């Protein structure tokens, strides 16, 4: 079944295009992209993930073998392959992905001399975006041209922050980049929400980070906290989200609650 055959939610509003972004690695960007998309699919929202990270974790997170792919997002960015032909079905209902492979790493350099280099992603998503309730762009852990493309294509950002020392380190730099893109390339760019990941209620550090983030971001901080669980870490090696791998796990339940908050803000 092609993605055209799957219907959007009956209560659908405009498509939301959300860049999941934090230039720090290991904060749960791809984990959030995969599990939030799966949770939204379970709640009837047709969702697309654009894997924009050369590591391709959002691609392998659905059990897609990157070695078997003929094309990936790189080909749409630089070889004019239409995005429509890159959309793959996943093992989760109503969830689709445009995959990434390590080939995407070369795009940073190749985009430098490209015409309309900042708007490549925006332009290639335009013909298909109305097909979906939500589109998530899983950004690379850097603030280069790929990330600028993501910020130009998105209407808002979701920032995952790990509950650890120096949690807010680097966020200031990210907000500066957003401000620059907003003033020059994408006037409507906004913060959709800030998500705290790898939360451990037993440690005072986790609770301290939650307080810091909530006081810094106010009501932009999601109420749902994503716990640190073995099942969340384990699920990608089985090629599926924790939502389907261990639906009763507290991590899966947290992502289902997060999806409700995301729908409410749409």
Label each PLM-derived region with a short phrase.
Residues 1-266:
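P-loop NTP-binding core
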């Amino acid at each position: 079944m092609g993605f055209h055959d799957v219907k959007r939610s009956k209560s659908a509003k405009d498509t939301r295009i959300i860049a999941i972004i934090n230039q720090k690695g290991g904060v749960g960007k791809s984990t959030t992209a995969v599990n939030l998309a799966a949770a939204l699919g379970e709640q009837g929202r047709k969702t697309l993930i654009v894997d924009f990270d050369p590591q391709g974790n959002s691609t392998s997170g659905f059990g897609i073998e990157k070695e078997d792919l003929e094309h990936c997002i790189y080909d749409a960015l630089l070889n004019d392959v239409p995005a429509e032909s890159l959309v793959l079905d996943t093992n989760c209902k109503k969830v689709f992905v445009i995959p990434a492979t390590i080939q995407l790493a070369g795009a940073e350099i190749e985009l430098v001399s490209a015409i309309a280099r900042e708007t490549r992603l925006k332009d290639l998503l335009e013909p298909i975006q109305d097909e979906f309730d939500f589109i998530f762009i899983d950004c690379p852990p850097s603030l280069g041209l790929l990330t600028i493309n993501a910020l130009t294509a998105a209407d808002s950002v979701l920032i995952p922050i790990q509950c650890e020392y120096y949690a807010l380190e680097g966020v200031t730099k990210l907000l500066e980049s957003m401000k620059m893109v907003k003033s020059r390339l994408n006037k409507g760019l906004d913060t959709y929400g800030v998500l705290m990941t790898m939360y451990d209620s037993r440690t005072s550090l986790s609770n301290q980070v939650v307080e810091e983030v909530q006081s810094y971001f106010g009501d932009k901080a999601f109420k749902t906290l994503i716990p640190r669980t073995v099942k969340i870490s384990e699920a990608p090696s089985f090629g599926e989200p924790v939502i389907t791998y261990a639906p009763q796990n507290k991590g899966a339940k947290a992502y289902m609650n997060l999806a409700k908050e995301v729908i409410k803000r749409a």
